[in-house]
């Protein structure tokens, strides 16, 4: 009986579960790549090669999604905000503020609010391609300074892959 329960559970965890970020690991999403911070887990069930990268740490989720061809950060932001609202996880509000990463990528950032979580939506545009980065944490476990530092480091590591 134990085998009938344990084997499917272990197989499911090995295929769908979360995998710890490895030192030096780099994740590529279309024309973008970034280096996830140690201590986070790659959510293999929600992540899809070249489509979305989802990292989790406790009650915090860091999701990167390529937006395809975009002519401006403002247009890309509006599209990403609509997509986020359509998920039902919350909505993006407030006026977006300009942001520039350590590698010189530019974009905008605005707060995300919801019934169970809060965070930010950042959109970067480079080389005519857009990237949406959402960071959310459940209200029961707000962001810590260490997580905020990890997020800044990961956002600053985003770069355009040479084609």
What are these regions (language model features)?
Residues 1-60, 116, 128-129, 138-163:
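N-terminal targeting sequences that direct proteins away from the cytosol to non-cytosolic compartments
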Residues 52-79, 122:
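A short acidic-to-branched-hydrophobic micro-motif
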Residues 50, 73, 99-102:
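A short acidic, often aromatic-flanked loop/helix-cap motif at beta-alpha or helix-coil junctions
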Residues 66-68, 136-139:
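Short, histidine-centered active-site or binding-site loop motifs used for metal coordination
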Residues 73-81, 144, 151:
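Generic alpha-helical secondary structure
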Residues 133:
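Glycine-rich phosphate/pyrophosphate-binding loop shared by adenosine-nucleotide-utilizing enzymes
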Residues 84-129, 152:
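Signature of long, low-cysteine stretches enriched in small and polar/charged residues
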């Amino acid at each position: 009986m134990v085998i009938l329960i344990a084997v499917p559970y272990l197989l499911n965890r090995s295929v769908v579960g979360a995998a710890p970020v490895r030192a030096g690991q780099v994740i590529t999403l279309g024309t973008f790549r970034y280096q996830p911070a140690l201590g986070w887990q790659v959510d293999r069930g929600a992540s899809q090669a070249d489509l979305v990268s989802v990292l989790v740490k406790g009650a915090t989720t860091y999701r990167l999604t390529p937006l395809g061809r975009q002519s401006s950060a403002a247009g890309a932001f509006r599209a990403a905000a609509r997509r986020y609202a359509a998920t039902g996880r919350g909505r993006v509000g407030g006026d977006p503020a300009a942001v520039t990463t350590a590698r010189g990528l530019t974009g905008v950032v605005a707060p995300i609010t919801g019934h169970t979580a809060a965070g930010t939506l950042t959109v970067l545009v480079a080389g005519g391609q857009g990237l949406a980065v959402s960071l959310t944490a459940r209200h029961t476990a707000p962001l810590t300074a260490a997580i905020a530092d990890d997020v800044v480091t990961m956002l600053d590591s985003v770069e355009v892959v040479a084609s």
